[in-house]
Amino acid sequence: MTALTQAHCEACRADAPHVSDEELPVLLRQIPDWNIEVRDGIMQLEKVYLFKNFRHALAFTNAIGEISEAEGHHPGLLTEWGKVTVTWWSHSIKGLHRNDFIMAARTDEVAKTAEGRK
């Protein structure tokens, strides 16, 4: 468990700061299995989780939906047979905010107990 899993998201307005170049490697070390993807010039955190079937993948997707609603911060979710791709970024600032790292860490926590993981 990391400090990120214990933190809560804060409201993120359009003028909120992006994660700084100094903060980025420190935060990434706390979520080592996540990748940074850049789409349309926007940095995003992304990770693929594998499952034994669609039912387990869908249950995981719904669990991520629950924690997202609780924190008011929502990912991109692609649910396929045996696979869920989770992508975190802050839409309002078009990039990465500390909230994204908090939710990536929380996603990993949910995955630890998710049924049907490969």
Swiss-Prot record:
Keyword Lyase set for record: yes
Keywords: Lyase
GO BP terms: tetrahydrobiopterin biosynthetic process
EC number of the protein: 4.2.1.96
Domain of life, per lineage: Bacteria
Record InterPro entries: PCD_sf, Pterin-4-alpha-carb_dehyd, Pterin_deHydtase
Catalyzed chemical reaction(s): (4aS,6R)-4a-hydroxy-L-erythro-5,6,7,8-tetrahydrobiopterin = (6R)-L-erythro-6,7-dihydrobiopterin + H2O
Entry GO MF terms: 4-alpha-hydroxytetrahydrobiopterin dehydratase activity
Similarity section: Belongs to the pterin-4-alpha-carbinolamine dehydratase family.
HAMAP family hit by this protein: Pterin_4_alpha
The protein's name: Putative pterin-4-alpha-carbinolamine dehydratase
UniProt organism field: Pseudomonas paraeruginosa (strain DSM 24068 / PA7) (Pseudomonas aeruginosa (strain PA7))
